[in-house]
Amino acid sequence: MSRAIEVEKITKTYRVKSRRGLFKSSVEFVEAVKGISFTANYGSIVCLLGPNGAGKTTTIKILATLLLPDSGSARVAGYDVVEEASKVRENIGLMLTVEKGFYGKLNGRENLEYFAALYGLPRNIALKRIEHLVKLLELDKLGADRKLYEEFSLGMKARLSLARALLKDAPILLLDEPTLGLDPPSARKIRELVRDMAHRENKSILYTTHNMFEAEIVCDRILLINKGVIVAEGSPEELKDKIPKLKVINLVIKASGDPGKPLERFTFRKEIKQEENSVFNVKMYVPKPEEVLGEIVKALVNSGHEVVNVRVEEPSLEDVFIYYSEGSI
């Protein structure tokens, strides 16, 4: 079987016009995607993981034929996204911003019937498919199949948006931040469904997120993307193994003053966050914590700070992303 998705050196630059004063304006060019390449197989979930503005949504829109790439090529289900756009659209289910495109004066079921008609599904098949999706996504339990869309909660909107993406039962799903802003139960439900669809129904799923935890538990393979460039790829464990063998010293400190001051002489990367009032969380990334931990604690105590808790941990996926996006940790 051919690859579900094949992307080869695609680029996309936006022309952004900004006004300067009453009569003057200037034009800037923003490179959203800078020659990225990757593939995705059927039966797996590939995650584009990166911060806002990294190029995730632009990539999804190119693969969905909503944007043309400036250069490079991409094939979805074996079809070229530029030359065979209609064939691409037949083979994908797309979920973008959860609130886009639905009709407020229709209920959930009526919205799905409307989109099924737009997609050209025969009515008898559409009604059976909608009934299946209403139960699968528990829209009936939430009353979302009967309530007007304008009365939906964000979680109900997300489930309906996913149902719309699944209407055609397409072999390839493009899901752009599907759990963004959702409460934990709704987010968990969507993550479980996504994994089930990939592994039981052999669908290929391209899933974007900026949530490290979500990427680690949902995705089979992760593409770390930053400023339009894929900086690393692999399974969560493979990515962790690629960075230098560092450990994380995690300290909780009750501080009397600036806790960073006594740590200045230690040249390791440090992250200091104030949790509440005088309580700080300090992370230090070191190759051999057993050689420096005593000195670190001593420096803090001698400066009048109370060390409440100390843990030595393996690097997280977040640490991996920091390493690849900033060059080192």
Give residue ranges: language-model regions.
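Short, charged/small-residue-rich alpha-helical element at the C-terminal edge
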Residues: 248-320, 324, 329
